[in-house]
């Protein structure tokens, strides 16, 4: 998942979007 799509991707998991080296990382809220 790209950084652009990260917020939507993570919100479905009720997680916080974070970017690491241009990769999407979801952190539990």
UniProtKB/Swiss-Prot annotation:
Q: Which UniProt keywords apply?
A: Disulfide bond, Ion channel impairing toxin, Potassium channel impairing toxin, Secreted, Toxin
Q: Which family does it belong to?
A: Belongs to the short scorpion toxin superfamily. Potassium channel inhibitor family. Alpha-KTx 08 subfamily.
Q: What is this protein called?
A: Potassium channel toxin alpha-KTx 8.4
Cysteines paired by S-S bonds: 3-19, 6-24, 10-26
Q: Quick check: keyword Amino-acid biosynthesis in the entry?
A: no
The domain comment in this protein's record states:
Has the structural arrangement of an alpha-helix connected to a beta-sheet by disulfide bonds (CSalpha/beta).
**SUPFAM superfamilies on file:** Scorpion toxin-like
List the Gene Ontology MF annotations in alphabetical order: ion channel inhibitor activity; potassium channel regulator activity; toxin activity
Recorded GO CC terms = extracellular region
Q: What is its main location?
A: secreted
For this protein, the record's InterPro entries field holds:
Scorpion_toxin-like_sf, Toxin_alpha-KTx_8/9
Species annotation:
Leiurus hebraeus (Hebrew deathstalker scorpion)
């Amino acid at each position: 998942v790209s950084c652009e799509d990260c917020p939507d991707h993570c919100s479905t998991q009720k997680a916080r979007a974070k970017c690491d080296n241009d990769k999407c990382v979801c952190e539990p809220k």
